Design a protein with these regions (language model features):
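Class I S-adenosyl-L-methionine-dependent methyltransferase catalytic core
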Residues: 1-198
Length: 198
């Protein structure tokens, strides 16, 4: 894995030994192609950060700050080491369960990334449902912000009825689906947002 572009482009990303499914470079490259210049000056939140690859990419591309949230204690030092190796500033690592952190946090972010454990078998947590129904998460997204959710393609869930999310872009890459959500409470006859809204 590596940082794809920006001031730290090409620098390898160390991965925690406990991380089973790091986001592939080609998926991240596609995501940032869709986001365009939105990273410049952005306040970023990287949930289920793992190696920190999404947040590192944002900082490399000019984001003002990034909070990396990851419950695995082994990941925090790895993210910190990745930041140092890449010479990136503005990164803060929070070692905490995502749900607990969301409930305690205030402030707003222009870009929120979430790459939770996949729902692959009975008994796995349905993080799509949890995140898309989270009032705490919607409260953290700044006006005009984007929520990027990476999911297992076979179990990706739409927002629950009444949830204020509109899916602007959806792309599948093998077993992975990436969706870009906008916070929206449209009128009943309003047109659904599309890529042009990003």
């Amino acid at each position: 894995m590596r940082i794809i572009s920006g001031s730290a482009g090409g620098i390898p990303i160390a991965v925690p030994k406990t991380l089973l499914r790091p986001t592939a470079d080609r998926v991240r490259e596609a995501v940032f192609s869709m986001l365009g210049e939105r990273t410049e000056g952005a306040a970023v939140l990287d949930l289920f950060a793992g190696s920190g690859s999404y947040g590192l990419e944002c900082l490399s591309r000019g984001a003002a700050s990034c909070v990396f949230v990851e419950s695995d204690r082994a990941a925090g030092p790895v993210i910190a080491a990745n930041l140092k190796k890449a010479g990136l500033t503005g990164g803060t690592v929070a070692t905490a369960p995502v749900e607990s952190w969301l409930k305690a946090k205030t402030g707003q972010f222009d870009l929120i990334f979430a790459d939770p454990p996949f729902l692959k078998q009975k008994g796995d947590r349905d993080w799509d449902a949890v995140l898309l129904a989270s009032e705490e998460l919607t409260g953290l997204l700044a006006p005009g912000g984007v929520f990027v959710l990476e999911s297992f393609a076979k179990s990706a869930q739409p927002p629950p009825p009444g949830a204020p999310w509109s899916c602007a872009v959806e792309r599948r890459y093998g077993d992975v689906v990436v969706r870009l959500f906008l916070f929206s409470l449209p009128a009943p006859d309003a047109a659904a947002p599309g890529p042009a809204d990003l």
